[in-house]
């Protein structure tokens, strides 16, 4: 709604093209938010064969003002094409380019809200002990959480939980930024090896004089993800893979061990 509200105000606005890359979830959300709106064209890039059939159907079957393009590559390749388009000033002006990816700050502003909502659901005495484990791919969600903390939300600590695409955990562990080829995993919305929000994360830590070493992290493989999903089901919670990864990382944070982990089955 935050993205689409301005386009609902008038059918006389200049035409806008929403160019978005998706690793699975964003595509459907964007397509349904803008579907049928006047003067708005949506172009969604996604990695061919690397999202689930259900996710693909959710945004590839609408037609109308929603166009989809399957890219022979991974999400990082899709994201690179979006960045390339936004670097072309003539193209931006001609098409009225905008985006629903986190390259657009309004995406993060909306995500800030549910951190406050989550904290509000806790008893007052528990809020200063809040540790949030964030399933992370492109790291926009974690960036939003850090922005919430910078606005005064009393979050004690964050945990960045990734799948096998572990560029950030390896960087935090060894100090070397060394992206590898993106791996397809059960948690496909997190299949990102070059998260473009990571510079924002580092900048927030720098500006707020927070120590990056306080950021917890865990890289969780598919077998461990499956085990976490089974454990959650056994206690009455039906989870999808992304949340299961975050839960596993949070569970590890409660054990008396070092604050950073790499899990194995």
Question: What is the role of each PLM region?
Answer:
Residues 247-265:
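C-terminal non-catalytic interaction/assembly regions of soluble proteins
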Residues 17-53, 58-59, 65:
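Glycine-rich, mobile lid/loop segments that gate access to catalytic sites or pores
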Residues 3-10:
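Short, small-residue-biased leader/transition segments that mark boundaries at the very start
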Residues 13-16, 37-42, 63-66, 93-94, ...:
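Short coil/turn connectors at secondary-structure junctions
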Residues 19-32, 52-53, 136-145, 168, ...:
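Short glycine/serine/threonine-rich phosphate/pyrophosphate-binding segments
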Residues 55-103, 107, 159-245, 249:
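Active-site/ligand-binding loops adjacent to catalytic centers
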Residues 80, 84, 89, 93-148, ...:
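Domain-scale recognition of functional cores that engage charged ligands
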Residues 13-30, 42-44, 128-138, 259-264:
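A short, small-residue-rich loop immediately preceding and capping a beta-strand
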């Amino acid at each position: 709604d935050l993205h689409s509200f301005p386009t609902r105000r008038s059918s006389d606005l200049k035409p806008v093209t929403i160019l978005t890359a998706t690793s699975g979830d964003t595509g459907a959300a964007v397509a349904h938010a803008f579907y049928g709106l006047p003067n708005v064209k949506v172009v969604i890039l996604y990695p061919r064969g690397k999202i689930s059939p259900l996710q693909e159907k959710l945004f590839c079957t609408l037609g109308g003002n929603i166009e989809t393009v399957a890219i022979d590559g991974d999400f990082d390749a899709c994201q690179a094409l979006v960045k390339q388009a936004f670097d072309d000033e003539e193209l931006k002006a001609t098409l009225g380019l905008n985006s629903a990816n986190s390259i657009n700050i309004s995406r993060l502003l909306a995500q800030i809200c549910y951190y406050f909502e989550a904290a509000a659901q806790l008893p007052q005495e528990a809020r200063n002990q809040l540790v949030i484990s964030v399933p992370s791919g492109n790291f926009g969600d974690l960036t939003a959480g850090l922005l919430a903390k910078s606005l005064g939300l009393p979050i004690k600590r964050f945990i960045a939980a990734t799948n096998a695409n572990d560029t950030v955990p390896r960087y935090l562990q060894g100090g070397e930024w060394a992206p590898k080829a993106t791996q397809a995993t059960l948690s496909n919305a997190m299949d990102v090896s070059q998260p473009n929000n990571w510079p924002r994360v580092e900048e927030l830590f720098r500006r707020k004089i927070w120590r990056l070493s306080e950021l917890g992290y865990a890289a969780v493989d598919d077998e461990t993800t499956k085990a976490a999903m089974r454990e959650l089901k056994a206690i009455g919670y039906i989870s999808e893979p992304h949340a299961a990864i975050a839960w596993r990382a949070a569970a590890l944070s409660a054990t008396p061990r070092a604050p950073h982990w790499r899990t194995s089955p």
